Amino acid sequence: GQINEETEYVLNRFGVQPPGYLSNIGTQVKDMDIRLSPEANKSMSLKNAWDLMQENSIVSLPIREKDGTLEGLITIGDIAKTYMDTTDSYLLSRARTQYQRIAETIGGKVIEGNGHGYFIQGKIMVATANPDKMKEYVEENDMIIMGNREEDHLQAIEQNVSCIIVGLGIEVTEKVLKLAHEKDIIIISSPYDTFTISRLINQSIPVKYIMKTESLVTFNTEDFTDDIQDVMIKHRHRAFPVIDKKGKCIGTISRRNFLDMHRKKVVLVDHNEKDQAVDNIDK
């Protein structure tokens, strides 16, 4: 409680600042083993996010602003769900996916055009028919996954696709490169076959397209563990972001962290009793 007049006089006499008032000494979130989160931003691809989570053995990844504040959250389950949904051929354009990210995800590189541009319109197609048949299903601004036939590449350029992806590391002819350059068509070369490319390509979309940004359940480092247990039980998440005093996200905690909390150590002096001491001294 508040210091009495005698104590205040002695402290003033010797120029000592009075100790801070402490009403509760219970275990807090900052006393838990907070799992520090690796740096992750909303522009990174799902594949990069997945790799980061695997490397750090985590199931939830906080997405942060440049100043460290929490912007969203993505889980392994979110990524797996997107990976399994392979029927949406417009996914990459709706997610405004960068060509460079696409190239990285399929282990390739941009060999023609501006890799920093974005795929914002059209669907993804695998070209398996002859050039005449392509006219029936390939539309302007589509992204086409193709093999090594020059006539197919030329037909795709004639139909004004936005991007051509060539598999198996096959070299594209100078004629194709020249025409693609004239029409601002991106060409990406990948060492993988068309089947593998079509399986991997959805992982190139940016994290921001699927991350959760609303109704996030977070805890503060100053929160008492007694207060957060019921919240954790109510929301059956695998991990919860932790925010420090400066409003920055520093990591995550889970229910398992209750097993290894670092309880505060207290020394009672002046014949003090527990029932006369600060709240939660026995916790």
What residues fall within each predicted segment?
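N-terminal beta-loop-helix "entrance" segment that forms/cooperates
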Residues: 2-17
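Short, glycine/polar-rich helix-capping loops at beta-to-alpha or helix-loop-helix junctions
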Residues: 4-7, 171-178, 274
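Short hydrophobic alpha-helical runs that function as membrane-insertion/retention elements
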Residues: 19-21, 61-62, 144-146, 162-168, ...
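A glycine-centered beta-loop-beta connector
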Residues: 32, 53, 61-77, 232, ...
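A short, polar/charged loop-to-alpha-helix boundary motif
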Residues: 76-92, 257-266
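Long, charge-dense
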Residues: 89, 177, 182-212
